[in-house]
Amino acid sequence: MQQMVPASGYDRAITIFSPEGRLYQVEYAREAVRRGTTAVGIKCNDGVVLAVDRRITSKLIDVSSIEKIFQIDDHIVAATSGLVADARVLIDRARLEAQMNRISYGEAITVEALAKKICDIKQAYTQHGGARPFGLALLITGIDRHSARLFETDPSGALIEYKATAIGSGRPIAMEVLESKYDENMIVSEGMELALYALSKTTEELKPENIDMAIVKDSGKLVEKISVDEIEKIVKAVYKKVEAEEAEAEKNKVEEDIE
């Protein structure tokens, strides 16, 4: 008689499905993402925005050494959440794929093609023994001949295109903000403010020096990293907006109590 595999065995082997059809190692990899830094991506009428709260855990850390947004090609940029070492491997591979496309075909790779190549790599690591899934989610965005594109990849290799999305520990809260505030006709400057507004809801204090932000505009189609000084201006505007909302909510509460 065939001996049954203990339940605990299903979460040790990456290539074995549980009786419920689950790959536990992939789910554990997703948990690494859920514990990661919060990243927000927004597709605007004239470009795209990425913003990440780097979540500096010690005042002794050199903030400039913590990078969460990476330029892949002239027109493509990616934000990461999850295991830092895994991010380095996939970012290097993405850059390699982008350059190989230029050499082979004499043109820049499209955002969708690059995202699919990265997802193919991620998927392969869920199907072969002797390895583990990447504990990493990526937001891959940029401008190509199809205008602005924004893709999210998860540890299983799944690929979804969004108008606006978030990954990391603050995803549930950030998604609530995006679902209520996002407008397809907003411009990049408004998208930058919305991204930081969403991040402000996921943390006690939003510090400009801890924010990594990049944009790609339709006009230039080139990745542009946003300076700390500019981020600071937007953060101040965001907190003014938050204070105004809180004051309005308090006013409404008082009026309800009076009634």
Swiss-Prot record:
Known partners and oligomeric status: The 20S proteasome core is composed of 14 alpha and 14 beta subunits that assemble into four stacked heptameric rings, resulting in a barrel-shaped structure. The two inner rings, each composed of seven catalytic beta subunits, are sandwiched by two outer rings, each composed of seven alpha subunits. The catalytic chamber with the active sites is on the inside of the barrel. Has a gated structure, the ends of the cylinder being occluded by the N-termini of the alpha-subunits. Is capped at one or both ends by the proteasome regulatory ATPase, PAN.
Protein name as it appears in the record:
Proteasome subunit alpha
Single GO cellular component term: cytoplasm
Write down the superkingdom of origin. Archaea
Described by its record, this protein's role is as follows: Component of the proteasome core, a large protease complex with broad specificity involved in protein degradation.
Q: Which Pfam families match?
A: Proteasome (PF00227), Proteasome_A_N (PF10584)
What compartments host this protein?
Cytoplasm
CDD domains, alphabetized: proteasome_alpha_archeal
* Family, similarity comment: Belongs to the peptidase T1A family.
Please report the organism this UniProt entry assigns to the protein: Methanococcus maripaludis (strain C6 / ATCC BAA-1332)
The record's annotation in PROSITE patterns points to: PROTEASOME_ALPHA_1 (PS00388), PROTEASOME_ALPHA_2 (PS51475)
Report the InterPro entries cross-referenced here: Ntn_hydrolases_N (IPR029055), Proteasome_alpha (IPR050115), Proteasome_alpha-type (IPR023332), Proteasome_asu_arc (IPR019982), Proteasome_asu_N (IPR000426), Proteasome_sua/b (IPR001353)
One biological process term from GO is:
ubiquitin-dependent protein catabolic process
Question: Is rRNA-binding there in the keyword field?
Answer: no
Instruction: Decide whether keyword Cytoplasm is in the record.
Output: yes
Q: Which UniProt keywords apply?
A: Cytoplasm, Proteasome
Documented activity regulation: The formation of the proteasomal ATPase PAN-20S proteasome complex, via the docking of the C-termini of PAN into the intersubunit pockets in the alpha-rings, triggers opening of the gate for substrate entry. Interconversion between the open-gate and close-gate conformations leads to a dynamic regulation of the 20S proteasome proteolysis activity.
> In the UniProt record, what gene is named as encoding this protein?
psmA
GO molecular function, a single term:
threonine-type endopeptidase activity
